[in-house]
From Swiss-Prot:
The keyword Transferase does not apply. Residues 1-22 form the signal peptide. The keyword Electron transport does not apply. It comes from Cyriopagopus hainanus (Chinese bird spider). Disulfide bonds join C52-C66, C56-C77, C71-C82. GO terms for molecular function: toxin activity. The lineage of its organism: Eukaryota, Metazoa, Ecdysozoa, Arthropoda, Chelicerata. This is U4-theraphotoxin-Hhn1a. It is found in: Secreted. Monomer. It comes from the Eukaryota. Its main location: secreted. Expressed by the venom gland.
Length: 85
């Protein structure tokens, strides 16, 4: 009877440890996936910077004051650059 109880408790402990390790691996893999879009965000930021500076340069050449273009998604034009609000 004691041997059966020890075997059951050992199996339960192994199952808990295995489940915990699997959850940790899944969390790590999700963190790795979250890190991937950073390069995509950098490309979007560069595009916003380019659009903002180009629109200001075009307005300056037309002898008009540079009206800063409103950047979308929480960004605004400042000093011919899009900056996060």
């Amino acid at each position: 009877m004691k041997v059966t109880l020890i075997v059951i408790l050992t199996c339960a402990a192994v199952l808990v440890l295995h489940t915990t390790a699997a959850e940790e691996l899944e969390a790590e893999s999700q963190l790795m996936e979250v890190g991937m879009p950073d390069t995509e965000l950098a490309a979007v930021d560069e595009e916003r910077l380019f659009e903002c500076s180009v629109s200001c340069e075009i307005e300056k050449e037309g002898n008009k004051d540079c009206k800063k273009k409103k950047c979308k998604g929480g960004w605004k034009c400042k000093f011919n650059m899009c900056v996060k609000v």
